């Protein structure tokens, strides 16, 4: 199975976690003073250094040379990236883009004096993230040696000037340690004489100055955390990275030794939230910029970030009134109280039950002590492979039962319970709901608890078939209000429910903009001819002069533009409907709040101006991907962002469905216009991929629209996977081409690596075969199967194990089947089995055989060969039958093909499928052959009618009950008498089990020979008759073909004679 490619931030965080543990993270390495510009990565082409997380990511690669560049930049410099070198990914954000300026009246491009289109810069409301791959100078041949920058300044003087210009209060000698005290806004340092050098003193002073920048009057970071806390460690991480950057810039070095105590907290923070390092690196850059600004002759006044007032939402008490606390049974409440103690780190009081014992008694299973509160409900099926049964997700199969699982804090899952029967899903969801209530009551924080109650209520309303749309909307709004209040009061919950917009906001600095004079009234919207424009055709209508109406979320033909070219997109009755609605609404002053959500006034707010607009009352619409005037908006201040006042705007956001469809296409999935895909319902779906045969669906995806739309895609043909999250824009052609190229490269690399492994294994098997000997006396396996000794099969020196070589159609040996004395079978590791087989009698004998007779295993093939008196083929398993049949049919196209299949009737009863029969029939159909199956004596391979029937469901219940009773007998679980009695009722009786066991012993032609009352004579009669009929049919077919060919030749001769006359 292909490894899932992790998001960029998780890859970066995981590498840094490993380096933190080893003490080798970039900011953990000490640097000597006097070497400026030697450590922070830079791009020699642009002359600029990499910043933020990109600098951390590149430094973490461990190269001594700080120079990094793209492949193209290296080539442009006359250098060449060495073959086989692996690049390092970085990311950057695009906050503006160029657009062609169009005439507002005609919609045509505006040209300059040279006839070229005039370009205008548009600030993006939804910044876009891009990725690039860079290589270190040590990976590139042909670059000149690194020239170290000579330090032409006094690092001490620069540092002293910065400290003096900052105006910070610095006190010496009061303490033996260095620290910044937020309450007095002062830096405290030991006496200068206590430092080993001046560089060390100034490096320490600048580190504390980094903390000083976090004061509310400066960069306003959260400094209200006690020494040793997680919040304190996060602030230290920011100051430490900033010190590293400043140390490289000034040349005063960097000494991280005194901050080793924070390593554990840093690791924990990155494990819980990989994005923390991104935020820390961004804040470190702000610290560095703020500090270095004091070097300039004219110190610019630093503006403080505007405080964001809490939204006017429901109070805590109002929320609890809106969403009633769900009822909880006394026993469940006791579990919640115990769980709360565990989460707080306390042990249960003496005499009280442990959490495991309490949950086992009350719920029937143990809840893990590190349970996160999350529960997963999953549809499952049981499958059997190589004699072993296992539970797997149902996927697109009919679920056999539903499982409930609890999430561990470390990310794993623990099975809790299974449910079968017609109400299985309902019962599983009811248990999940019960556990959600327990988790909510176990939550100590009242705001987070209220949010959990609201989620439970929303889920119950969603599942209730009697709920109306109004009920669902009200429940959703109550949940959002509760989560919003919790977010404002709880830092940890804020981190966990932060979505992609916050992720973007943390990575970019806000830009302040001057406010425009207030307007008395918003201009009335002119009459507009609205259009029905598919997303893919938006560029076409835009080029013709159409504009986007954010409030109606539709394209329209502006006044003065000829409507004729837009005829195919005309929306009948749409314009009239909009006008009628507008006339029916009373005119209101612009400063008043809109009446309802559907009457929102949308705005065109560039990303850099979002904080100013937010302070004026703008709010973000996640669905429309646009800002709008909130309920308490000051329309006078928002006037400047009304769409009509912003001539150049970013194109409307692509809908999640269209964006997900584009992602599917980029992954090689087939999405047809007007087709059913994608289905964004949160369920699993199969989809056709490029290169699939008719009926195949090698693609798989899950997509949902709840909250922040997201999904997962996998192309099983290429092995490439994608975790998708809506961004509001589609991939451009270059990005699509890059993704497709990466998929093709991965597919080729996988195929190349697999071929290499197969070849190496084939050579290893060849060497191993030299120590084996041909079989002269039957091995234990051959004796057990009643088989004669046939040439080509090998054994060890003791004659105990059986070795069966497997070849391809060209005669090359790729693998070997090893059979132990007890019949256990396995193949060589990393070997090729598909399309490989063993010929009983050898390839020369097969060439002389009248037909290609192919069986699943060696025992079947050898039994049939002894009955027919000519060579047969063993394909080793049912899944390999078709590949072997196609390979041999291509080599011997004139020979008829007979598939001697297994009849797995006991599997049909217990699992609902008969893999032996199905695979044999598919193989025969693929080559125009015939599938034959053994016919046993009455009662040998049939389930007795007098016994109670067995279905896949009650067989699964039997296995579950058998396991639970075995666990109870071993002391692993405790069962009540009622539970024990109920489980025993689910067990199959002895007669049923004996019948299944007997059927399992009668499936193939070797069983017919050795275990059936019909014996070898039965095999001979059946296979000779079946193969003889196939040969007879083939002979007749060939005779008919010959006659047809003779007729054709005679007609051609008559035509030639006629032309002669």
Swiss-Prot record:
One of its GO terms (biological process) is DNA replication. GO terms for molecular function: nucleotidyltransferase activity; single-stranded DNA binding. Keywords: DNA replication, DNA-directed RNA polymerase, Nucleotidyltransferase, Plasmid, Transcription, Transferase. Residues 1034-1061 are annotated as: Disordered. The keyword Nucleotidyltransferase applies. GO terms for cellular component: DNA-directed RNA polymerase complex. Pfam families: ArdcN, DUF5710, MPTase-PolyVal, Toprim_3. The keyword Ribonucleoprotein does not apply. Residues 850-938 form the Toprim domain. Its EC number is 2.7.7.-. Required for autonomous replication in E.coli. Transferred into the recipient cell during bacterial conjugation. Catalyzes the synthesis of short oligoribonucleotide primers with CpA or pCpA at their 5'-termini on a single-stranded template DNA. This is DNA primase TraC. It comes from Escherichia coli.
């Amino acid at each position: 199975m292909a490894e899932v490619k992790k998001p960029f931030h998780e890859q970066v965080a995981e590498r840094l976690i490993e380096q933190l543990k080893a003490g080798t993270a970039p900011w953990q390495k000490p640097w000597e003073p006097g070497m400026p510009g030697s450590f922070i990565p830079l791009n020699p082409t642009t002359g600029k250094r990499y910043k933020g997380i990109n600098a951390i990511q590149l430094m973490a690669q461990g190269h001594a040379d700080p120079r990094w560049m793209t492949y193209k930049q290296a080539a442009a410099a006359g250098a060449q990236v060495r073959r086989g070198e692996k690049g390092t990914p970085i990311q950057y954000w695009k906050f503006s883009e160029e657009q062609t300026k169009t005439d507002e009246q005609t919609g045509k491009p505006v040209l300059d004096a040279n006839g070229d289109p005039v370009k205008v810069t548009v600030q993006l409301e939804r910044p876009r993230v891009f990725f690039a791959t860079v290589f270190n100078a040590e990976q590139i041949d042909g670059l000149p040696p690194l020239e170290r920058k000579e330090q032409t300044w006094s690092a001490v003087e620069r540092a002293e000037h910065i400290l003096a210009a900052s105006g910070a209060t610095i006190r010496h000698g009061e303490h033996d340690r260095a620290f910044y005290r937020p309450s007095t806004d002062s830096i405290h340092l030991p006496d200068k004489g206590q430092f080993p050098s001046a560089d060390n003193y100034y490096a320490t002073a600048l580190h504390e100055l980094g903390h000083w920048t976090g004061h509310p009057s400066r960069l306003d970071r959260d400094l209200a955390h006690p020494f040793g806390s997680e919040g304190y460690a996060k602030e230290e991480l920011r100051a430490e990275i900033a010190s590293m950057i400043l140390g490289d810039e000034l040349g005063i070095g960097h000494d991280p030794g005194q901050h080793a105590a924070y390593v554990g907290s840093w690791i924990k923070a990155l494990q819980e939230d990989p994005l923390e390092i991104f935020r820390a690196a961004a804040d470190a850059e702000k610290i560095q910029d703020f500090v270095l600004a004091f070097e300039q002759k004219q110190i610019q006044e630093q503006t403080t970030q505007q405080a964001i007032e809490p939204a006017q939402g429901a109070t805590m008490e109002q929320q609890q009134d809106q969403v009633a606390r769900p009822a909880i049974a006394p026993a469940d409440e006791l579990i919640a109280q115990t769980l709360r103690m565990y989460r707080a780190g306390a042990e249960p009081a003496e005499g009280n039950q442990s959490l495991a014992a309490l949950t086992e008694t009350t719920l029937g299973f143990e809840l893990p002590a590190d349970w996160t509160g999350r529960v997963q409900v999953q549809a499952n099926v049981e499958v059997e492979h190589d004699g072993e049964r296992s539970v797997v997700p149902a996927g697109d199969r009919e679920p056999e039962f539903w499982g409930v699982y609890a999430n561990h804090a470390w990310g794993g899952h623990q099975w809790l319970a299974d449910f079968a029967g017609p109400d299985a899903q309902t019962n599983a969801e009811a248990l999940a709901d019960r556990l959600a209530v327990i988790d909510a009551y176990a939550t100590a924080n009242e705001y987070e608890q209220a949010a959990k109650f609201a989620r439970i209520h929303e889920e119950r309303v969603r599942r209730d078939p009697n709920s109306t749309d109004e009920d669902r909307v009200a429940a959703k709004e109550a949940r959002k209000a509760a989560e919003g209040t919790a977010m404002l009061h709880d830092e940890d919950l804020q981190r966990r429910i932060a979505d992609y917009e916050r992720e973007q906001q943390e990575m970019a600095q806000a830009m302040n903009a001057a406010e425009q004079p207030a307007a008395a009234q918003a201009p009335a919207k002119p009459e507009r001819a609205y259009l029905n424009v598919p997303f893919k055709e938006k560029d076409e209508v835009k080029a013709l002069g159409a504009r986007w109406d954010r409030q109606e979320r539709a394209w329209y033909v502006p006044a003065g533009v000829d409507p004729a070219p837009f005829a195919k997109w005309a929306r009948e009755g749409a314009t009239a409907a909009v006008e009628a609605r507008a006339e029916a609404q009373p005119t209101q002053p612009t400063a008043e709040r809109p009446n309802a959500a559907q009457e929102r006034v949308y705005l065109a707010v560039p990303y850099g101006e979002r904080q100013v607009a937010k302070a004026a009352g703008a709010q973000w619409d996640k669905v429309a991907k646009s800002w709008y005037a909130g309920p308490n908006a000051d329309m006078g201040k928002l006037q400047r962002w009304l769409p009509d006042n912003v001539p150049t705007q970013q194109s409307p956001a692509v809908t999640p469905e269209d964006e997900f469809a584009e992602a599917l296409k980029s992954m090689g999935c087939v999405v047809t216009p007007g087709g059913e895909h994608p289905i964004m319902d949160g369920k699993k779906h199969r989809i056709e991929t490029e290169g699939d045969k008719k009926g195949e669906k090698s693609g798989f995806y899950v997509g949902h629209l709840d909250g922040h739309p997201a999904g997962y895609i996998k192309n099983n043909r290429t092995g490439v996977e994608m975790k998708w999250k809506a961004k509001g824009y589609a991939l451009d052609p270059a990005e699509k081409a890059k993704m497709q190229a990466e998929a093709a490269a991965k597919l080729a690399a996988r195929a190349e690596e697999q071929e290499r492994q197969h070849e190496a294994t084939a050579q290893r098997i060849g060497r191993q075969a030299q120590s084996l000997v041909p079989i002269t006396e039957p091995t234990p396996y051959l004796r057990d199967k009643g088989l004669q000794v046939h040439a080509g099969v090998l054994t060890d020196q003791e004659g105990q194990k059986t070795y069966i070589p497997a070849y391809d159609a060209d005669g090359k040996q790729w693998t070997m089947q090893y059979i132990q004395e007890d019949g256990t079978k396995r193949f060589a590791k990393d070997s090729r089995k598909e399309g490989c087989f063993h010929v009983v009698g050898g390839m020369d004998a097969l060439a002389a055989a009248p037909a290609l007779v192919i069986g699943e295993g060696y025992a079947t093939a050898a039994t049939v060969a002894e009955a027919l008196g000519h060579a047969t083929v063993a394909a080793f398993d049912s899944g390999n039958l078709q590949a072997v049949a196609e390979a041999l049919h291509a080599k011997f196209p004139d020979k008829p093909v007979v598939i001697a299949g297994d009849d797995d009737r006991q599997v049909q009863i217990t699992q609902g499928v008969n893999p032996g029969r199905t695979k044999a029939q598919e193989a025969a159909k693929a080559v125009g052959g015939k599938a034959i199956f053994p016919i046993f004596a009455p009662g040998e391979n049939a389930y007795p009618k007098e016994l109670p029937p067995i279905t896949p469901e009650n067989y699964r219940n039997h296995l579950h009950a058998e396991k639970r009773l075995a666990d109870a007998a071993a002391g692993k679980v405790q069962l009540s008498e009622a539970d024990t009695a109920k489980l025993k009722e689910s067990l199959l009786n002895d007669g049923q089990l004996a019948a299944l066991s007997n059927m399992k012993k009668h499936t193939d032609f070797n069983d017919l020979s050795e275990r059936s009352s019909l014996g070898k004579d039965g095999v001979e009669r059946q296979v000779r008759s079946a193969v003889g009929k196939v040969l007879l049919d083939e002979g007749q077919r060939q005779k008919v073909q010959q006659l047809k060919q003779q007729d054709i030749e005679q007609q051609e001769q008559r035509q030639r004679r006629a032309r002669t006359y």
